[in-house]
Structures are given as C-alpha cells and as structure tokens.
Amino acid sequence: MAVLRLMLRVWIVLLFAGVGSVNAIQVEVAPGQVLQIHPSDAAIALDGQLNESIWTELDHYDEFVVIEPDTLIKPSHRTRVRLFYNDRGLFVGVEAEQPTTTLVARLSSRDNRQIKRDNIGLVLDTSGEGRYGYWFAVNLGDTLMDGTLLPEKQFSSDWDGAWEGASSTTSSGWSAELFIPWGIMSMPKQSGERRIGLYMERFVAYLDERWSWPALPDTVPRFISALQPIAVQDVTPKQQFSLFPSTAITRDRIDGETEYRLGADLFWRPSTNVQVTATVNPDFGIAESDDVIINLSATETFFPEKRLFFLEGQEVFTASPRADTRGGGVGNRGAPYTLVNTRRIGGKPRLPVLPGEGEIRVKDQIQPTDLLGAVKVTGQNGQIRYGFLAAFEDDPEFLVTDDAGTYRMVGEGSQYGAARLLLEDKPGGAYKSVGLLSTMVLHEAGDALVQSIDGHFLGANGKLKIDAQAFTSDKEGIERGYGGFIDFEYALKQGVTQRVGIEYFDEAVDVSDFGFIQRNDNFRIRQSHIRTRSDLDWARSNQFDFRGFVQKNAEGLFTQGGLFFSNRSLLNNLHELVFRLDLLAGAYDDLNSFGNGTYRVDPRAMASVGWASNRAKPLSFGGKLGYMGEELGGDSSVMSLFATWRPNDRLSVDAMLNYLNRKDWLLHSQGSTMGTYAAEQLAPGFGLEYFINAKQQLKLVVQWVGVKARSGSAYEIPDQPGDLMRRPDLDVSVRDFSVSQVSVQARYRWELAPLSDLFVVYTRQSNQAGLLLDRSFNEVFQDSYQAPVTDALVVKLRYRFGS
C-alpha cells in the first residue's frame, strides 16, 4: 500500500512538472458562473507575443463554439483566453491555434469590417446590466477595430477609443494581446465588486467561420443581456484627461488661398460615469470623402457620420434602432429615421436671400460650413443616462455674380443643441426604458425645435422586442407637426424572426434641420420575415428575407407599396450567391413633381442575381445582372463587376464598374411637365491601399458617376391626382442632359500614437450638370474634372496629451 501511495505522489509530481507555459490549467465554465478575474500589476509589452511570465501563471478558458454558421459545435482548432486586470485596465491574451499555412493577415484602415481575415474580438458590457457596451477587435497584422453596443445587438463602428492591441504569428498559429483602459469606457459609479459582461469572438478566415464564447449566434434574440459575467474588485478609474491640440494647413487651389488653422479637442472624464468632450476651431478637411451618388429624386440621400468628435459618445442620442439601418442582413432595411443626424452640423450652408438677380458660385453652395466649436456631455446617474450637445457654426461666405460684377456676401451659420434623458429599469427580468430627446436649431431664417419620447421593451427571454418613438416639430412659419412609429420584433425560433412596424407622419412634421426622415405626410405599415439556416447539405448557410409595406398620404392616396424577396447563400466552396425580386404596386407619386402635383405610376418589377467568389482569397471578384421596370412601362437593365486583389497583407487594389441602361426613365422637367429619357449611367471606381506598416497608410480612391440622358416624350401633370397626360407639343421642352460627379482623394496617415495622427490629404471633387450636347462619356468626364468645386491639399497634425 505504501508503494502505491509513493507511485501516486510521483505521478502527480511528474504530471504538474510537465505542464508547460502554453498548457496552463484550463478552467471549465459552468452556466451562470461568475468568473473572478485575477488582479496583477505585471508589466506587459503589447507586442502580441504572450512571452511575459504572467501569461504562464494564469488559468485559461477555451469555451468557444462555432456560431457562423450557427452549428454550435466545437471548433476544429483551440483558442485559449487569459485575462487579468489592474487599476489601469483589462488585459487579454489569446492563443489561436491553426496551421500556419492557413493564416490570413491583411492590413487596412481602422474599423474595416468588410475584409475577411483572422481576428480576435472582445465585447464588454461595462454597465453590468445589459444596458450598453463596447466592442474591440485586433486583426492578424495589428489593424484595430472598435465601436459601441446598445441593447440587444445594435453594433456601431462610430467610436474610436484609446486602447492598444497587437498580434504575432507563432509556430502553432498566432496570438494577440489587448489592453483596454477603464478610463475610455462609461461605467456606473460603484465600489467593491464590479460585474462586467464578457464576450469573446474569433474569426477564422480560411474556414470562413466565426467562433464565440459564450455561444451567441446572430440567429438567437439575446446578446448583450446574455454575456459571460466576470467580476473585478475595487475598479474605480482615476480621472481621465486628454487634450488634442491640432494644426492644419489647407491650400485651396481654386481660390489660390492658404488657410492656417489652430484648434484643440478636449476629452475629460471626471469620474467613471461622466464624460465631457469639446472642440474649438476644428478642421474636418481630412475626413474621408463620401461615396459618389447621383440622386435626381425628391428624397434625400443619407450619409453616415465620419468625424471623430461627433462619433464619441454618440450612442446615448440613439433613440431607436431605426437610427442606424446599416446591417449585415441580405434585406434592404431602408433609410434611417433619426432626430439627431450630426452630419447636419457643419454641412452645406443655408443660402442667403440675394438682394437682386444674382447667382451664388456652386463651390460655395456645397462646401462644408466651418465650426467655431462644440461641446458634449454624456453620463449616467443610477438608472438615468443623459447627454447634452451644442455646436456653433461660423458665418459662411459666398461669391455672388450678377450684372454688376462679382462680390462677396456673408451668410449666417446655425447653432445646434440636443438634450437626451434615458431612464432604464433595474437589472433582472425584462428590459424596459423610456427616453426624452429634444433638439434645437437656431438660424436667422427661422428656428426649428423638435421634442420626442421613446420607449423600449425586451422580454426576459429576448424573444419579444418593442421600440416606439413619438415626436413633434415646431418650425418657424410652419404649424406644429406630429409623427411617430412603433416596431414589434419576435423571434419565433432560432434563425426565424418576424418584424412589424407602423408609422405615421403628418403633413407639417419636419425634423430635417437636425434629423433625418425621407418624407412626411405618410402612414405606413411594414413587415419583414427573416429565416437563416445552416443545416444544409448544399450550402454553408442560407438567409431568406421577405419584406413588404403599404403606405398612403393624408389625402388617402396609395403612394407606395410592394413585396421584396432576397436570398443569400454561402456555398460550400465559400462563394456567395444572391437573388433579389422586388414587386412594386401601381401607386400615386406625390413627391417627384417637386410640388407640382400628383400623378399615377404603373406597377413594376425588379430582379437581379449576384455572385461573389471567396473573399478570403488573394484575388476575389464578382458581379451582378439585373432588370428594372420603369414607372411608365419602360425596361431597364443593370450590370456591375468588381474585383479585389491582395497580393500580400500590405497592398490592396479594388476596382468596380456599374452600368445602368434606362428606357423611359421618368423625371421632372419643369413646372407641370414630366419627361421620359433614354439614359445611360456609368460608374467606375478604383481604390488602392498600401501600408508601410500597421501605423502608416497610403490610400487613393477615385470614383466617378456619369449620366447621359436623351429626351423622349413630354407629359403633363394633371390638376387632380391621376394619369400623366401625353403632350407631344411639349417634347421640345424636354432637353438632353448630362450629370457628372467626380471624387478623387489621396491620403497619407501616420498614427503616431493612439488617436494621434499626421494626415496629408488631397481632395478633388466635381459636380456638373448641363445639356448633353451629344458628348461622349469621356467628354462628360473631362469637362467636369476640369471644373472642380473642391481642389484642396490639407496637412494636419493632431496629438493626444493626457492621462
């Protein structure tokens, strides 16, 4: 017996002696278990190599399952996660096993989620109660991504934090280190034990699989309320203060002027639950150009915010999921509805009333308005979250030409304000909240005020979700308007979701001074049904999306309605196939006459098929073919091609070409006259991105959209809503025309430190419309390119100082 005890002791000693640095004890996590994270003041060199002794001392977790496709099986490779913290922040170390020949490392600009490459992601619910959170990711190659999260899974990339992440290849795959400072995140004020929700994610590019811990695929309703709870002790971040002085030099090659600008941004977090941000004399000339879009309709195109100051802390002003309709689903979610669209601030200027018959230079009509400054306060006090925003525009200048010559005229900038309060329920059970939002725009042409109330409900099991918002607008010279909507979403089972929405906007409601809705005078009912499956033999996954809506205006006229079918299949060879079919009913168009009456359009159909190769390969390509019916019965076709070449992790070349051939395209001509056109639209694009290293980027983007339209038939809008009346005698008034928009931007960016950059940006943009005069596409392009409305070189240095 003594011999057996001795042998047992020797076996135990040998067992633990054989545990190497990469084989620390693996901890199995029980359902609902709160993980106590290890505190340590160990020094870490953030290089992704996990070679500090602390990483060998910590237990590790490997609880990952496959969530995309949502098979929930154990992955084919191991992923070991280790965590520790101190009063500065949370440290995360990850070992990702896989064959080294399968690694996919591609550098890109920050927050580019479209590229398929190996990465490690992390979500933290710092509220500890499923109210709000932050997500972080480091890609193999050290490109970072981050953003914010609202219930239940409203992910946004519109936030950049001062955190660090790095990666490194190993003999068994790759590894990553992340350091998340407590001070960059909002957290409730509390002492003692602090609960935080944790979610880890890994994307394996060569398999096109996403793995996560805990198991939360997109096909289940819950996310932020179902994260893995972890506990840390006595985390009370110190007061955080950051000052970002900046200097910018802008050479305007059109006016031949050079502008020198000094400015500063301030980020101050006096406690864990309050943040103050301010900017003085900012320069946004280095912001990335918007996509080139030609829109000749009466509805506005929405462009997302790209300026860092307005992205920081913006989530508290999100009063509804409708505020951000960007998503990964195959269905078209439409334009957003939001009362706070910060792109209005510093956007196109309000044009002044001219004293006589003059004309304002096109450049001055579309140039962004300079800002004098802005301030924003966001925070939390118990169950209440709040936010306040104020911004002040400078007075814009306009070059006016009339019969007497050319002179300069000074307009007036606007002042913007927004206030937000959100009361959330206590943790446990269903999530309930109610919010108030008020906005104000002051301008000499008239002030605009908007007030709203919103409510949100999420069942305890995450299946039923309700979001509602009601608002009223008070605009000088217009009677008070009212509007609102309510959305219901129910998860029938895993992978099957049904949504129903009802909205009403009266004829007077107008939130466009600060917010964004595409139209008022509208009563609409809409629905969507989405099914996602991964238990298929012929494909990795398949998503079917069926949507439909009907709407009418205050006169009771049916203004639009249709059924929309979309299906996206990810095939077993990782190629993608997308089918779309839209069936639009005959309806009355009360917008595109631009206030000259209402007319009836025919029912029509649209269909397309698209294919794309495996985007994880060095060369990927695809295209689309489609058919589109016109409003008076014409037949149009669309074709697009695209390709991406990534010969290595530093270089990326993109090329695309869209071509649209329209027959009987119906457009407003003048007054009560509509015209049809035979039109061609050509839209080539080219992008080149080269990374000297992960911190230095060269980027060139060239986009052009050109339209050549030849006149067809003239129609008269009836006095009362009805069919358009053919008017051969007015054919001569319908003229051939062309439109050309060109955007060229070359950027050099050097990230000197987190959120500290040197930019050199050259931007040239053209926007020209006029008579076609039998010109070719090449001539249309050349004429507009030689007459730019923006031609500027900007050099900007911004550096972060502070704690």
Residue ranges, per PLM feature:
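Surface-exposed extracellular loop regions of Gram-negative outer-membrane beta-barrel proteins
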Residues: T236-T277, Y386, Y416-D474, D535-W538, ...
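Bacterial N-terminal signal peptides
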Residues: M7-V19
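Exposed, low-structure sequence patches enriched in small/polar residues
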Residues: D370, K465-S803
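Outer-membrane beta-barrel proteins
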Residues: P181-S191, I224-D234, R251, P270-V274, ...
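Alpha-helix capping and helix-loop boundary segments enriched in small/acidic/polar residues
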Residues: R253-I254, D265, S297, Q365, ...
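Outer-envelope beta-barrel architecture signal
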Residues: R88-L90, Y132, W174, G192-I196, ...
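Structural preference for beta-rich elements and adjacent junctions enriched in aromatics
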Residues: A24-L422, A787
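N-terminal secretory signal peptides that target proteins for export/translocation
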Residues: M1-M7
